[in-house]
Amino acid sequence: CRTTDTRYNVVRMGDAMAEVFGQAGISVLHDRTLYDYPEYAGSYDRSLAAIDRYLKEYPSIRFVLDVHRDAIETADGGQVKVVSEIEGQGIAAQLSLVVGSDGGGLSHPNWMENLRLAVAIQEQALTDYPTLMRPLLLRNSRYNQHATHGSLLLEVGTAGNAPEEAELSA
């Protein structure tokens, strides 16, 4: 369910991921802005402006991860949740990497670098957690991934997953 309450939305997933990356010694700049509020229209333009601003302010940024929760509905409008049992930890929301390309006609000359990164992440994740990842998706849209190298979209479960399931995926 879509909400602006950061205890239940994608910002919480970003908080959890930032904590895990930080514990691994990886510096994180976590933008907690809801770019799709109050409406979806223009959300990618708004987030692209922020990405450009951050890249100028912090030129050492090596990766941009756009975190989403997928929306999968049943024929009657119910929410589908995607799960993976993580041994000894519980039920986690499955993850899906989405890679944009220039297939829609917009310039994205380095999309294959992002695809290689996604494949490497997918392979490692499947080695460590065999059921955690859904199939990698290659799309014709850019999803602002043209702004920099090392840019991916990550779907953390779906709107049907409990926040705790999505948080465990971090």
For the regions a language model picked out, list residue spans one by one.
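Active-site microenvironments of hydrolase-like enzyme catalytic domains
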Residues: 51-102
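Extracytoplasmic/secreted envelope proteins and their assembly/folding machinery
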Residues: 14-18, 45-52, 115-122, 151, ...
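Active-site-adjacent mobile loop/cap segments within catalytic or ligand-binding domains
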Residues: 134-170
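Solvent-exposed loop/turn segments at secondary-structure junctions
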Residues: 34-38, 69-74, 102-105, 141-144, ...
